[in-house]
């Protein structure tokens, strides 16, 4: 008996057509042509920051076009198979539909990322909270989780700094995710993450609760006008260290930068040279200063308009329970799964996509 796929194909076609309208594919093609002209200008590379911004936007725009065109081709192929009525082709098309539907849904989420900085790379900082050695171990687990998530998507990452705890785990870690819409995607992870498990560090095998904070900021571009006066900086050079303060470098190449007006401190010790560490630390400092400015502007807007405070900022957003049962649950969207090992190995897309949809619905109601 032939499978009738007409209704599913019709629904997917309507969804994809809506996505093409929102993304304005023809507009994307014009944008790509303009960026290609800019990238071909030999003078562009005299300004490395601008050149990198242009090439990043070009890569992102080409990626959007390729995703839409690829999905449209796949849907057209399935529709053509359905029209032919061949049972073997229909069976193959029916098997392909769930994956195509999932991919279209993923692109639909991408259309919701329209914030001013959503297109940027992301700086992610992890910090151990309450919970002692378990919190430090939890911070290390989160670092691995996010790096695995990026690896699954083929995204480049760069770890700028890790501060190891005395017994195990990490006090903090800072890394960059280099991918189109990395900030818009990962900003859903900003907040406090709570772990419940039997502590491997407790001789009595008691259940322990530990916390770690995740802070996500966009990478700064020249257009953001985040100007830093050299006289506002204190730069300390020191030797990179490993667990227990043991030196792992034979030269003083690690860099700590303190922004005196705000008290913001950033550190980088994972690069090979002092100059590379300083450059990486400045990237993080600029991102933090931009985020501080945005927070101040948002607070002033709320004061003027009398709008509600953002209670989700810095608050507990997700529970990871490994004992007495297995469950990861997001407290904002109620998305949950018992596949804790998968989540900790980077399977975060269901949580991230649900939060992006939830965030947009909240913004639309405001």
From Swiss-Prot:
It is found in: Cytoplasm. Belongs to the prokaryotic/mitochondrial release factor family. This is Peptide chain release factor 2. It comes from the Bacteria. The modification N5-methylglutamine is found at residue 246. Keywords: Cytoplasm, Methylation, Protein biosynthesis. One of its GO terms (cellular component) is cytoplasm. Peptide chain release factor 2 directs the termination of translation in response to the peptide chain termination codons UGA and UAA. NCBIfam families: prfB (TIGR00020). GO terms for molecular function: translation release factor activity, codon specific. The keyword Methyltransferase does not apply. Methylated by PrmC. Methylation increases the termination efficiency of RF2. Pfam families: PCRF (PF03462), RF-1 (PF00472). Gene3D superfamilies: 3.30.160.20, 3.30.70.1660, Release factor. PANTHER family: CLASS I PEPTIDE CHAIN RELEASE FACTOR (PTHR43116:SF3), PEPTIDE CHAIN RELEASE FACTOR 2 (PTHR43116). The gene is prfB. Its main location: cytoplasm.
């Amino acid at each position: 008996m032939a499978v009738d796929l007409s209704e599913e194909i019709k629904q997917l076609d309507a969804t994809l057509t809506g996505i093409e309208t929102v993304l304005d594919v023809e507009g994307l093609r014009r944008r790509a042509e303009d960026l290609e002209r800019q990238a071909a200008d030999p003078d562009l590379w005299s300004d490395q920051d601008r050149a990198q911004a242009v090439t990043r936007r070009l890569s992102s725009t080409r990626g959007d076009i390729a995703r839409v065109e690829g999905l449209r081709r796949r849907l057209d192929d399935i529709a053509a198979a359905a029209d032919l009525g061949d049972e073997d082709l229909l069976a193959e098309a029916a098997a392909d539909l769930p994956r195509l539907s999932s991919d279209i849904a993923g692109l639909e989420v991408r259309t919701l990322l329209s914030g001013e900085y959503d297109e940027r790379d992301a700086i992610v900082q992890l910090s151990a909270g309450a919970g002692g050695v378990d919190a430090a171990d939890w911070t290390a687990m989160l670092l691995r989780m996010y790096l695995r998530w990026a690896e699954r998507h083929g995204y480049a990452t760069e770890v700028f700094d890790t501060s190891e705890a005395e017994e195990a785990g990490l006090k903090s870690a800072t890394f960059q995710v280099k991918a189109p819409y990395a900030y818009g995607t990962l900003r859903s992870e900003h907040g406090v993450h709570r772990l419940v498990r039997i502590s491997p560090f407790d001789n009595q095998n008691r259940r322990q609760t530990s916390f770690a904070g995740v802070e996500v900021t966009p990478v700064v571009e020249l257009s953001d006008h985040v100007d830093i006066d050299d006289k506002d900086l204190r730069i300390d050079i020191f030797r990179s260290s490993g667990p227990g303060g043991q030196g792992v470098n034979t030269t003083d190449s690690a860099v700590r930068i303190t922004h005196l007006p705000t008290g913001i401190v950033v550190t980088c010790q994972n690069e090979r040279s002092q100059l590379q560490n300083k450059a990486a630390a400045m990237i993080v400092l600029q991102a933090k200063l931009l985020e501080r400015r945005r927070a101040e502007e948002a607070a002033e807007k709320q004061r003027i308009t009398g709008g509600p405070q953002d209670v989700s900022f810095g608050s507990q957003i997700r529970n990871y329970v490994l004992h007495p049962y297995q469950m990861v649950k997001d407290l904002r969207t109620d998305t949950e799964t018992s596949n804790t090992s998968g989540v900790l190995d980077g399977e975060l897309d269901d949580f991230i996509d649900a939060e992006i949809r939830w965030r947009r619905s909240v913004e639309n109601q405001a």
